[in-house]
UniProtKB/Swiss-Prot annotation:
Belongs to the ATPase B chain family. GO terms for molecular function: proton-transporting ATP synthase activity, rotational mechanism. GO terms for cellular component: chloroplast thylakoid membrane; proton-transporting ATP synthase complex. Keywords: ATP synthesis, CF(0), Chloroplast, Hydrogen ion transport, Ion transport, Membrane, Plastid, Thylakoid, Transmembrane, Transmembrane helix, Transport. It is found in: Plastid, Chloroplast thylakoid membrane. It is a single-pass membrane protein. It comes from Morus indica (Mulberry). In plastids the F-type ATPase is also known as CF(1)CF(0). This is ATP synthase subunit b, chloroplastic. Pfam families: ATP-synt_B (PF00430). F-type ATPases have 2 components, F(1) - the catalytic core - and F(0) - the membrane proton channel. F(1) has five subunits: alpha(3), beta(3), gamma(1), delta(1), epsilon(1). F(0) has four main subunits: a(1), b(1), b'(1) and c(10-14). The alpha and beta chains form an alternating ring which encloses part of the gamma chain. F(1) is attached to F(0) by a central stalk formed by the gamma and epsilon chains, while a peripheral stalk is formed by the delta, b and b' chains. F(1)F(0) ATP synthase produces ATP from ADP in the presence of a proton or sodium gradient. F-type ATPases consist of two structural domains, F(1) containing the extramembraneous catalytic core and F(0) containing the membrane proton channel, linked together by a central stalk and a peripheral stalk. During catalysis, ATP synthesis in the catalytic domain of F(1) is coupled via a rotary mechanism of the central stalk subunits to proton translocation.
Amino acid sequence: MKNVTDPFLSLSYWPSAGSFGFNTDILATNPINLSVVLGVLIFFGKGVLSDLLDNRKQRILKTIRNSEELREGALEQLEKARSRLRKVEKEADQFRVNGYSEIEREKLNLINSTSKTLEQLENYKNETIHFEQQRAINEVRQRVFQQALEGALGTLNSCLNNELHLRTISTNIGMFGTMKEITD
């Protein structure tokens, strides 16, 4: 088996290429062969290269068109979103205004209701005061009447004897009899 390092060691034994310079031997440099190969490559590779470039150009143009379409779609969506936003803002403002007017209306209703309730309470208070005054007046009248009656009975009992008592009863019976005859 050969040693792997043998080819590298053999490099040290190669002779040097000499000095650097231009080789003017046309057959040694082979420019004719190179120009023929380049000409064939250009002639036959021109179509392939132009097809590759055309395909690349078409893909780039298609990508640009797609990007433009996407941009226009995004702009349309943005405009729709802005339109919806304006609409929602208008509705929100309208709800806000309606809410404030509803609050004011409820406030006025509450004030009116409260004032009516206060008025009713004032009327109830006045009626209660009037009722209590009438009751107090009636109590005073009853006491005065009772005291007057007691005083009159006391006076009558002290001044009245049997004879006067019988005469008063007879007079009253006579008056009732006269009244009965008048009504018949």
